[in-house]
């Protein structure tokens, strides 16, 4: 059973009206002083752990008593979490810290359904909580009285520069303007059933300018990165995505790329470094670079719809503010682009709050994604299937003892539907994480009304001729593993590849819409140029022209017959995403041949 501590925070309001104080977050002109006093409720003689799994804090805010519930974020670090920095002579130093007993928590305010909290309890209480729609920050005061803390609103932190701060992404990944029904999107239980949690394994990279900004204090940098990751993890829980920190790399001696104010240049260089260096020594899904360099006119930039891509599953973030919440929201925004989320359009809504995916930072940083963001994200996940984020960590991989109520099925649990207040699973006893009497299951695509679905019930639909449907066995709540026909099997006058049937007509449709078809063979001869758009593959950064027999394995060309168009050799090219618009692997390029690594090869030898 989780041992809960009750800590009473007594508020003593010092005379501060008209005064200000300099905190880590900046100059604050209106604040309260609070004194946390810990009152344990552990059994007599019990050994108190350094950082409890769950805690409650009772305090007064604006004269009203509130109870803050906190639970240790057990999904913050992966089992194989590592940290890398460099000696003055450039030697790589990688360690694997013990992070089981960490001090980072998520939480909520009792009787406030819209409340959130992200708190570090390492040295006092530091972080933020939302109460009755308003964001409060809390941090220890550096006074001789070590128990003194300041509580204040974000709006009371003086801003050095009031000019709007923008994200550098200027184009949507896809146009969803016709789909304004997204503004009425409702997340149903059935929708959730077929959209389980995804898991993003994140590496944070800190540049040399950040090290200099922090006077070379690597421990200070690490603490800040943990706090940022804790908040990003909390934000994405509401998108059914777990973000786990699997690695931290600090460029302590020198930058491994040239970090320039030009965001496009820096993002491209960082992506190439991730592909050729970081991925070869650290398994992960996504990498974000934090820099203290002032980026020209923007505070962040990322590739859109690129999660799991070796180069483009990346973003860059300017360390724009000393307030962790602000930088964490920027990071969540840029990672959102990687997950296919566009900037919010005029009809998107977060209720009464600002939205994370606004093109510019809102006057108060938001922790909410809009209905459009949810639609964009899950449209990308469903239709483009970024496979790297599907792998759910096994219960035995969880680095800390299991915690009932964290919505993650762990060793010894039959189900986990969250806290008793939030559980909506009629099959699961939220207090014990055991199935209720008479229930066979509490989750899974083959679980209906707490019973195993009948044998033969379809649980995963066929996506193409190469991907047969899966059916329930009648003996398990889980749908059998997704299998597909062997690569190279005939389908739609083409050949199957990883469960899909990649024909050029479909690829043209995805790029340009209806009434667009595969172009004549003569158009593909342009791929022999080896110029910025016409090539077959890249080697060491150089674009390699197609050999005559390989021209249909380079840039895709389409014939546009849509109204008002008469383009017989239409192609797509973007500096931000050079790979988009290339013929997909496995596409038929001649009778009995398919595209593989920019070559048109015999289907019998391709797989």
Curated annotation (Swiss-Prot):
PROSITE patterns: ADAM_MEPRO (PS50215), DISINTEGRIN_1 (PS00427), DISINTEGRIN_2 (PS50214), ZINC_PROTEASE (PS00142). Expressed by the venom gland. Its cofactor is Zn(2+). Disulfide bonds join 308-388, 348-372, 350-355, 404-433, 415-428, 417-423, 427-450, 441-447, 446-472, 459-479, 491-501, 508-558, 523-569, 536-546, 553-595, 589-600. Transmembrane segments: none annotated. Residues 401-487 form the Disintegrin domain. Residues 1-20 form the signal peptide. The keyword Ligase does not apply. The active site is at residue 334. Residues 21-189 form a propeptide. Is implied in permanent muscle damage by attacking the collagen scaffold and other important basement membrane proteins of muscle, and by preventing muscle regeneration through disrupting the functions of satellite cells. Displays collagenolytic activity, fibrinogenolytic activity (on both Aalpha and Bbeta, but not gamma chains) and inhibits CRP-XL-induced platelet aggregation. In vivo, induces hemorrhage and fluctuations in muscle size by intramuscular injection into mice. Also induces apoptosis in endothelial cells, without triggering cell detachment. This is Zinc metalloproteinase-disintegrin-like VAP2A.
């Amino acid at each position: 059973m989780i041992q809960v501590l009750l800590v009473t925070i007594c508020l003593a309001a010092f005379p501060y009206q008209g005064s200000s104080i300099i905190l880590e977050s900046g100059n604050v002109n209106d604040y309260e002083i609070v004194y946390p006093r810990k009152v344990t409720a552990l059994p007599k003689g019990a050994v108190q752990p350094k950082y409890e799994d769950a805690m409650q804090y009772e305090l007064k805010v604006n004269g009203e008593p509130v109870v803050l519930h906190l639970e240790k974020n057990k999904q913050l670090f992966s089992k194989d979490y590592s940290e890398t920095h460099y000696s003055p002579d450039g030697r790589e130093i990688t360690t694997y810290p013990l992070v089981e007993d960490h001090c980072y928590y998520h939480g909520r305010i009792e009787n406030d359904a819209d409340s959130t909290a992200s708190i570090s309890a390492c040295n006092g209480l530091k972080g933020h909580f939302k109460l009755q729609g308003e964001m409060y920050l809390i941090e220890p005061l550096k006074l001789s009285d070590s128990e003194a803390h300041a509580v204040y609103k974000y709006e009371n932190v003086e801003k050095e520069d009031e000019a709007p701060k923008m994200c550098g992404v200027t184009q949507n990944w896809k146009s969803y303007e016709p789909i304004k029904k997204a503004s009425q999107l409702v997340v149903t239980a059935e929708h959730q059933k077929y959209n389980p949690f995804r898991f993003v394994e994140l590496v944070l990279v800190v540049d040399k300018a950040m090290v200099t900004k922090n006077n070379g204090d690597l421990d200070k940098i690490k603490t800040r990165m943990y706090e940022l990751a804790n908040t990003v993890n909390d934000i994405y829980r509401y998108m059914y995505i777990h973000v786990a920190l699997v690695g931290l790399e600090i460029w302590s001696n020198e930058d491994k790329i040239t970090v320039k104010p030009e965001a496009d240049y820096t993002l491209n260089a960082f992506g190439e470094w991730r592909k050729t260096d970081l991925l070869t020594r650290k398994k992960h899904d996504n990498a974000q670079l934090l820099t203290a360099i002032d980026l020209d006119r923007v505070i962040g930039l990322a590739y859109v719809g690129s999660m799991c891509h070796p180069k483009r599953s990346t973003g860059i973030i300017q360390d724009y503010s000393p307030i962790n919440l602000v930088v964490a929201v920027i990071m969540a925004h840029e990672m959102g682009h990687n997950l296919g989320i566009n900037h919010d359009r005029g009809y998107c809504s977060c209720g009464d709050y600002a939205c994370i995916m606004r093109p510019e930072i809102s006057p108060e940083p938001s922790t909410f994604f809009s209905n459009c963001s949810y639609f964009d994200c899950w449209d990308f996940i469903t239709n483009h299937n970024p496979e790297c984020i599907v792998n759910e960590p096994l219960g035995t991989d969880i680095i800390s003892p299991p915690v009932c109520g964290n919505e993650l099925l762990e060793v010894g649990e039959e189900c986990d539907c969250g806290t008793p207040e939030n559980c909506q699973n009629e099959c699961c006893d939220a207090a014990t994480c055991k199935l209720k009497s008479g229930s066979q299951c509490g989750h899974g695509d083959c679980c209906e009304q707490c019973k195993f679905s009948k044998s033969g019930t379809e649980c995963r639909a066929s996506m193409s001729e190469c991907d047969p449907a899966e059916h329930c066995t009648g003996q398990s709540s889980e749908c059998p593993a997704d299998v597909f026909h062997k690569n190279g099997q005939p389908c739609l006058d083409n050949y199957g590849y990883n469960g899909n049937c990649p024909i050029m007509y479909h690829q043209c449709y995805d790029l340009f819409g209806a009434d667009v078809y595969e172009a004549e063979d003569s158009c593909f001869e342009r791929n022999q140029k080896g110029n910025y758009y016409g090539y077959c593959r890249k080697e060491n950064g150089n674009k390699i022209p197609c050999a005559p027999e390989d021209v249909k394995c380079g840039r895709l060309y389409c014939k546009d017959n849509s109204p008002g168009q008469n383009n017989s050799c239409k192609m797509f090219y973007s500096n931000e995403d050079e790979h988009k618009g290339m013929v997909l692997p496995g596409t038929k390029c001649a009778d009995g041949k398919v595209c593989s690594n920019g070559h048109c090869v015999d289907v019998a030898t391709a797989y």
